Amino acid sequence: MTEHTDRERTKMSDTQIKPVRTSKQAKEEFESIVGQYLESNPIISTNNKTSELEIRFGTNPKVSKPINKMGYDNVVKQLYACGFKPENSRGNQILRIQNEFVDTRTGQIKMSNIRAEIVGTDLIQEYCRTNNIQKVIDMPSTLFNKIKFTQKMSAVDSKGGYIRKLDMEDFNFRVSYQTEQDFNVQSGLSRNIISKWTDSKKLFRSMNRVRFYHDEYPIFADISIVKGSKRMNRIPVPQYTIQEAEVFSGQESYEIELEIDNAKVGTGTAYDNAARLMTDLRKCIRIILSGLQESKYPIPYSEQEHVLQSYMRMVRGEGYQTKRIYPKDFIGPGSFTLQIENVIAHIEDSTIVSIRDNYCVTEKADGDRKLLYIANNGKIYLIDTNMNVTFTGSKTNEKTIFNSLLDGEHIREDKHNKYLNMFAGFDLYYVNGKSVREFPFINYLPPIETDENIEKGEIVAKKFRLELLSELIELLKPISILETSSNDEVEPKENKRSPDLIVKCKGFNASSEHGNIFNACSKKLSDINDGLFEYTTDGLIFTPMDLPAGGNTLNGSPGPLYKSTWEKSFKWKPAEFNTIDFLVSVKKDKTGRDEVHHIFQEGRNMEGNQEVIQYKTLVLRCGFDERKHGYLNPCQDILNDKLPSPEDLDNEDSYKPVPFQPTNPYDETAHLCNIILKGDETNLYMMTEENEYFEDDMIVEFKYVMDNDDGWKWVPLRVRYDKTSELRAGMKNYGNAYHVANNNWHSIHQPITEYM
C-alpha cells in the first residue's frame, strides 16, 4: 500500500459533498447513509479497518456562527442534563500531525491523508521539545495505543461508488461515513513516513477531547478544544516544526461531534436497522442543538435568519434592504450607572438629570437582557444583545399582537436555582407592526379623552407604553406548539397553554403615586428584602415616566434604532455588585515575553507557608472613541498638529482599546492589575474567582476591592466569553466603553447606599 495512490483513489474533498435541494431529500439521504453504514456490519473490524459514522456540528460558518466557548459549555451542560457521562472529565490531550509528500506520478507536493496521532501530555511535551517522532516512540512510557498512524477513506457503496458527505444546512451539521485504518509504528507505511519526518512540512492539531457516553444510546458525543497550525487567508500553513506553526499561540476553536459506537450496532444488536438507529440519532442531534441554541426547541438556522430580517424590516421600515445582522442592531437602550448628582434636587440651568423629577422604579432581575419578538405567525422568539435568536416553543393565537416587540429580562432560574424560564417585560416598542416608542412610559398626567373613532380592538389607541405592555401580556396567552406523544416523537399541538414559558409585566413604582421617588424606592426595596420576588434581584432600574423610549426631550423623538445608552435611564446596584468588563493584556519585558514577578522580591507573603508566589501584571483596557469620550492627550495632539476634522465624525476606526484612565477620582495606575498565578510546578495560569483560565486579549469582568493593597484592588470575577468571541471574530468589542467604565468607577468610589 502506498500513501499517494490510496489518497488519489479514496480521499474526498469538501467540494464533492452531496448536493441537497430540499429538506425531504436531505432526510432521505441521511437515512440512506445510515442504512449503508449498518450494512457494512460495523461491529466487525478487518485488518484494523473500521467503519465510522460521525456527525459534526457547525461545519459551515456561512450558515451559523462558529461554535464558541459559550456554545461548548452549554452543550456540556445539556449532555449532563440528559444523562450523558464523560469517560474522563479532564479529557485526553491529543496531537495530530499530517505530513506533506511528493506525488511520484505528478511531482507535486501534496498533503497526506494519513495522520500521526500522539496521545498523552508527557508524549506531546517530548514531541514539542524535540520535533522528532522517533524519540517519542522510543520513550519508555510509550504504549502501543499512545501513538499510531491513521488513514481515513471515504466509504464505498455496493456498486463501488463513493458515499459522499452530506451537509444538513438547516441545522448546520455534516454527516460523514468513512472507513478508518490504523497502522502501528512498526508497519512499513509508518516507517516510510517516519524516515522522512524532519524533511517534510506538517500540519498540526492539538486538542483536548472529552468523550461522553450514554447507557441507553449507542452514540458517543465528542467535544474538543482545538489549536492548530497558523493560518493565512483562513488556510493552515504547513511548517517543519510545531514552534514554526505557532500552534499554541493561536486562537482556540471548538468542535462537537456525534459518533456511532460500532460495538452496539449492526447484526445481532437492537440497532440492526436504520429506522431504529435514526430515532436515537435524532434525539442526540436535538440534545446538541438544544445546547448550541440554548433552547429546548432548536430551530433551523434559516428560520433564525428569517426572524432577524423580519425584525429589521419592522424596525427600519419597508425600505429596509437585507443585510448582515450585527450586535449593534439590538435597539433596546442601555442604562447609565446612577450617581449621587442624579439623586439630588434638580439645579436650575443644570444639564444633570435628577431622578426626583417624573421617574419610576422597578427591580433589576438577575437575568439576561432580551427582546421578545412575536412573529407574523404568532410564534414567540427571544433575541439577545448579540442578536442570537432562540425559539421559546410557544406561540399566541391573538392576531392583534402579531409583529410586536417587547424588551425585558429572561430569567432562567428562580432564587433557589430551580428552572423558571420567565420573561419579565419592562418596555414595549412595537405593537402589530406599529411603533409605540414615541409614547410616554406611564400616565403621569390627569386622564385625557381618547378619540372615539379609534377601533376598539386596537390597543395602540392608548398612549402609554407600560399600559400597552400590560395589556399585550394579558392578551398574549402563550401556548405550546409541541407535545410529546406516546412514541416519543414530537407532534404539533394546538390550544394548549404552555407550561414552559412564563411572560409577566414587571411592576413599577411611580414617584407620583408614592409622594416622591424615595418612597417609591423604599417600597420596592422592602418587597425585595421581604422575599416577594421568586427570582434573584441585584439592584434597581429608574425610567423616566414622561419620555419616549430612549428619548431625552418631552414630546420629542425616541432614541436611535441601534444599540445605545439612554442618558435618562439609570441602574443602581449595591457597590459590591458594580463591576467593569476590561480587555486584558499582560505587561511584556524587552524581549516580548510576559513579565513574571515574585512576591518575596517585595518583602510580601500572600499565602503564609508558600515561599515564592508568582504573579503577572495586567494592563486593563476599555473601548474609547475620541469623538464621544474626549481626547486622551489633547495638549500633545496640538503640539503634533493632530487636530480633529469634520471627516472624523464618520470614522468608524476611531473606536479603539486604550488603558483605562478614570477621571473622578483620577488614578493614573487604575489600568494596572496584579494577578497571582495558580497551577502546578510546571504550568502556572491566571485564573478568575470562578476558576476560569484567561490569557492575553480576552475580556474579563472585574470587581474593585477598596481594602486590598495598591496593585491588587482589581479582582477578576469571570471571563466574558460572549464579548471575547465577538472580539476574536473581528468585531469592535473591547469590554465596556470608556464612558460606562468611568461611570462605574465613579459609582464604586462614591456609592449610593440603600439608605441614602
Regions found by a protein language model. Give the residues of each.
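Beta-strand-rich binding-surface signature
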Residues: 52, 204-211, 218-220, 253-257, ...
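Conserved loop->alpha-helix
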Residues: 376-415
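Internal, well-ordered alpha/beta segment that forms a basic, Gly-enriched binding/recognition surface
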Residues: 412-441
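Compositionally biased low-complexity segments enriched in polar/charged residues
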Residues: 2-11
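Nucleic-acid 5′ end/cap handling module spanning
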Residues: 46-48, 53-58, 134, 140, ...
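Phosphate-end processing signature that detects enzymes handling 5′-triphosphorylated RNA
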Residues: 11-320
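Short helix/loop capping segments that flank catalytic or ligand/cofactor-binding pockets
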Residues: 221-223, 231-233, 266-269, 370-373, ...
